[in-house]
Amino acid sequence: MELKGTKTEKNLWEAFAGESQARNKYTYFASMAKKEGYEQLAAIFEETAGNEKEHAKIWFKLLCGGAIPDTLTCLDMAAGGEHDEWTEMYPRMAKEAKEEGFNQIAALFTMVAQIEKEHEERYLKLAQNIEDGT
């Protein structure tokens, strides 16, 4: 069956995003727990973050047809994601933040957009290196 365009595909993307966000949050929580001297709690957060990473990997593999793609495809996907972030997502977010009076947040969105542009350029160069065999 074709997954593209289905509710299930949408749900897989939502599950992937949720697990990915949880992993990052738990990693941040582990850092704070360590900083505050709660080593056991930090270890629990880190273990759970690892679980969330594996959950995200399950959903991502399904979205990719059952396996993580080859490196060249990964570079192309990464470049495309970075391109969307710096050309569409962050400019829109910066504009909206500025309209709402959050000028510092708007500036951060703009700054990160520039970094995402550099990421795209790097991925494209690396993909070209693979294609050229260098």
Predicted feature residues:
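Non-heme di-metal
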Residues: M1-T134
